[in-house]
């Protein structure tokens, strides 16, 4: 398997409108919690006939190694909030970003590349990041995830 180096770039990003559910989780529960949260969002959006985009997860540091996450779906034209599903915007501002192709379990390599770039560029991290998941593909090598670190 050929290792493709990550191309890191900076961008100014505007907010993306999401329908999302917030939770506090741990790295060990992360994948299970993301699926559980998205399983709350999608039925509501289908019921409302909302125009949807990609799945997005925003990560913020929590207490004692926990993570505060907002797991949701892009809703460019909005939706009607209900229950725990509420409107959330991705952060706006300058980011370091890269694109990962491969299984989600290998995303740590993309984060390592971004963190190396920030360290060598003397760019401090805010602690907030998010992932935008491309369309599903049964072939893990074709799964695209765009990773953003807020600077």
Residue ranges and their predicted role:
Residues 1-151:
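A solvent-exposed interaction/effector surface
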